[in-house]
Every structure is written in C-alpha cells, then in structure tokens.
C-alpha cells in the first residue's frame, strides 16, 4: 500500500525538482547556508510537487488509460480510489504550503501556490487537453521550484529569480517536445494537442532549436548578471552548444524517435549540470572576483 501511495506522487519528478530547488537555494545562499531553512524548503517543495502530481494523476486518469507509458498508473488500475487520492493530494498540499509559509517565507509559499495553480488548475484541467500552447504554460510551473529555492533565501523576487525562471522555463520546452516526439503515438491516441502531433515533427524540431538557443542565452545571464562564476559559465556554454548540436543533427536523422530519446536524455544531464554548477560556483557579494568553493 505504501508503494502505491508513493508511486502516485511521481517520485522521479519530485527528485528532479529537488535538484533544481537545491541549485536555486545554494545560488542565493552564496556559501552561507541556513540548514533549517534548507530542510524546510526542500520538504515543503517536495510536498507541494507531490500534491500537484497526485491531482494530475486524478485529472488525467481517463487519458492515462489510452497511453502505453501511463496505462499502469495507480489510479488507472484502481489501486487507490479517486476520492482517497483527492484527500491525499489535499493533505500533501496543505502540509507543503504551511512548511513554505512558516519555515521559509510568504514569498516562497506564494510562488509555490502560483506554480501549483498553473500546473493543476490551468495546465492539467484545461490547456493540456485543449491547446497546443499547453506545454508553454506548463513550463512556467515546472520552473517554479528553483525560483522558490532562491526566494526562500532572499525573500525577494529580483533579477536572479527572473533569470532562473527564464532558464528553467526555456529548458522545459525542448525537453517536453522531445518526449512528445518519441511518445508520438501515445499523445496521438489520447488526443493530446502537443506541438509535434498538431503541427508535425518538422515544426517541432524548429521550435526545439530556437528554444535551446534562447535557453543558452538565458544561462549566460547568471554570470553576466553577477550571480554565478566563470566555471558555471564554461559548463553552461558547453552543455548548451552540445545540446544545440544534437538538435541540429535532428534535421538529418532517419529515426526521429531515437534522436528524440537522446535529446531528452541529454536535457536531464544539462539541467542537472547547471543546477550543480550554480550551487558551487557563485559570485560573492562585494567582491571583484567571481569566486567559488574551492574544489
């Protein structure tokens, strides 16, 4: 039973979001870590993300039946009743928001609320099923965790928070389109209007390329804005160039699904590398040098 309640929260998504939360938090901390705040923020965001995922599973249980990769989800198989899942999701959300409000700060909590509302209320309930722009809207909620981590420390939505929002929102687009390409038949069967299905894979490849270019520019802004150091800059440039190269090779491949899986896989590597580098390579306030931890 515990396993089923864990599975419905999508632990893989929670883990991925925690990496970005840590990146945002440590970037803002600049080497001076408030450990109780760190724990409250991580647990709070984890609970909010878990709540959103359970609500998403509840909302999507009809279309999940039609998709190969989701047909065995807990709610689809009836291992947890829909009513119980709603109570479970609500309790997780309340606990998460309370931790962010009282353990971090009101701004972190409100950012969590906004990300949650966009994901559950706007994306899951409507945009995912009715608009080709659903992925774009969903990307905003996906970018909330690192911003929450950052603002939990600063208590202020400054240019650093805005840059993080841009980086992670732009990253979501090629990442999500790659999934839609190698899971094309699933999305088609469930009648989900993602870009590759509605406009075609060729158009999706153009969008992927443009979004990776925009992502590359956004990643550089952390250093140019005085938030991250040169080691971060080198890694950001390297992963962006490599990712862009992979995207461009997509115009010549014979098997789009194989290419999309590789692009998706590298997207995970790219965002993890950036999260790690912004955690350890930050600009110290009032310093003339871009300093970092000594490796």
UniProtKB/Swiss-Prot annotation:
Biological process annotations from GO: heme O biosynthetic process
Transmembrane segments: 9-27, 37-55, 78-96, 107-125, 197-215, 228-246, 268-286
Periplasmic membrane side: 28-36, 97-106, 216-227, 287-295
Pathway connected to this protein: Porphyrin-containing compound metabolism; heme O biosynthesis; heme O from protoheme: step 1/1
PROSITE patterns according to UniProt: UBIA
Catalytic activity: heme b + (2E,6E)-farnesyl diphosphate + H2O = Fe(II)-heme o + diphosphate
The keyword Transmembrane helix is annotated on this UniProt entry: yes
Primary location group: membrane
Entry-linked InterPro entries: Protohaem_IX_farnesylTrfase (IPR006369), UbiA_prenyltransferase (IPR000537), UbiA_prenylTrfase_CS (IPR030470), UbiA_sf (IPR044878)
Cytoplasmic side: 1-8, 56-77, 126-196, 247-267
Subcellular compartments: Cell inner membrane
Membrane-topology annotation of the record: Multi-pass membrane protein
GO CC annotation terms, alphabetical: plasma membrane
Disulphide bridges, residue numbers: none
EC number(s) from the headed UniProt entry: 2.5.1.141
Coiled coil: none
Keywords of the record: Cell inner membrane, Cell membrane, Heme biosynthesis, Membrane, Transferase, Transmembrane, Transmembrane helix
Cited HAMAP family: CyoE_CtaB
Misc: Carbon 2 of the heme B porphyrin ring is defined according to the Fischer nomenclature.
NCBIfam families: cyoE_ctaB, PRK04375.1-1
Function per UniProt: Converts heme B (protoheme IX) to heme O by substitution of the vinyl group on carbon 2 of heme B porphyrin ring with a hydroxyethyl farnesyl side group.
Protein family (similarity comment): Belongs to the UbiA prenyltransferase family. Protoheme IX farnesyltransferase subfamily.
Protein's name in the database: Protoheme IX farnesyltransferase
Organism, scientific name: Salmonella paratyphi B (strain ATCC BAA-1250 / SPB7)
Gene that this sequence comes from: cyoE
């Amino acid at each position: 039973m515990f396993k089923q309640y864990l599975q419905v929260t999508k632990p893989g998504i929670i883990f991925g979001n925690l990496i970005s939360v840590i990146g945002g938090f440590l970037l803002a901390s600049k080497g001076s870590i408030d450990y109780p705040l760190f724990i409250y923020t991580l647990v709070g965001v984890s609970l909010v993300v878990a709540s959103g995922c359970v609500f998403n599973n509840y909302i999507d249980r009809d279309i999940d039946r039609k998709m190969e990769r989701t047909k065995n989800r807990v709610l689809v198989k009836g291992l947890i009743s829909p009513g119980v899942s709603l109570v479970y999701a609500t309790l997780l959300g309340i606990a998460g928001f309370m931790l962010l409000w009282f353990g971090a700060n009101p701004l972190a909590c409100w950012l969590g609320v906004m990300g949650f509302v966009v994901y559950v209320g706007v994306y899951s309930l409507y945009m995912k099923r009715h608009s080709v722009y659903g992925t774009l809207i969903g990307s905003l909620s996906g970018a909330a965790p690192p911003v929450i981590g950052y603002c939990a420390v600063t208590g202020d939505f400054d240019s650093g928070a805005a840059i993080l929002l841009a980086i992670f929102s732009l990253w979501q687009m090629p990442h999500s389109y790659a999934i839609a390409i190698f899971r094309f038949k699933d999305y088609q069967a469930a009648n989900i209007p993602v870009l590759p299905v509605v406009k075609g894979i060729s158009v999706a490849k153009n969008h992927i390329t443009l979004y990776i270019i925009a992502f590359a520019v956004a990643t550089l802004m952390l250093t140019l804005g005085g938030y991250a150091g040169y080691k971060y800059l080198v890694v950001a440039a390297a992963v962006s160039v490599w990712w862009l190269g992979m995207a461009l090779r997509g115009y010549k491949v014979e098997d789009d699904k194989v290419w999309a899986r590789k692009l998706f896989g590298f997207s995970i590597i790219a965002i993890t590398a950036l999260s790690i580098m912004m955690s350890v390579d930050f600009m110290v306030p009032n310093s003339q040098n871009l300093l970092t931890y000594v490796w």
